């Protein structure tokens, strides 16, 4: 099968790329998405704040993705969901992919656009020392469990990192009944927007520990001590939490 443009990834960037390619005159366009629905990370971002610049209205993540998906219906862009790309042959402009329905496929594209998003840094990637108990989640994992799967990740939660996603998830955990004991930030300032600091931390009485980082995680079960320390000072503080969210 031959296409003018093959887009790998059906998240916000992939959807926008396919629509723009169509506007620029490409007639045979294919989107490959490994998930079972389009939208990517937007589907688990149920907070508002999207669409102000592009659509001139405030939308949630799923609503924002839905706008692009509706726009796709006015084009001839093809979509293959639940499809995994196995290999890209650069010399022959060929993609090897497979799914349950069509099986193995060789797809040829004059142009191949990669819109696969990014990977979160895990605990190992940011070198947090200590034991390995259950209850340590990355931002995306915690957000998906709560917003899509409907599972609470814990009752007593500590957030590492004060970017906007960390602040938003801290608020989300509080709304779901968890006790968020604090948000720990290595820098002497928060990396999130001021409005999110006010709406997500201050309004819910969640403390923000600036110039702090996690020095140690102890134990082999949930509900074990987590030590934080002020940078450049010997001021060790122990926070007994059962869940740690990493938002770096």
Placement of each model-derived feature along the sequence:
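A Rossmann-like FAD-binding core segment of flavoenzymes
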Residues: 72-99, 174-222, 226
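Conserved acidic residues
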Residues: 4, 110, 181, 242-245
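Active-site anion-binding loops
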Residues: 223-248
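FAD-binding core/adjacent interface of flavoenzyme oxidoreductases
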Residues: 1-8, 66-156, 226
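Beta1-alpha1 glycine-rich phosphate/pyrophosphate-binding loop at the start
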Residues: 3-67, 71, 153-199
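Ligand-binding pocket scaffold of soluble enzyme catalytic domains
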Residues: 14, 103-106, 212
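Short glycine-enriched, charge-decorated loop/helix-capping segments at active-site entrances
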Residues: 50-58, 126-133, 223
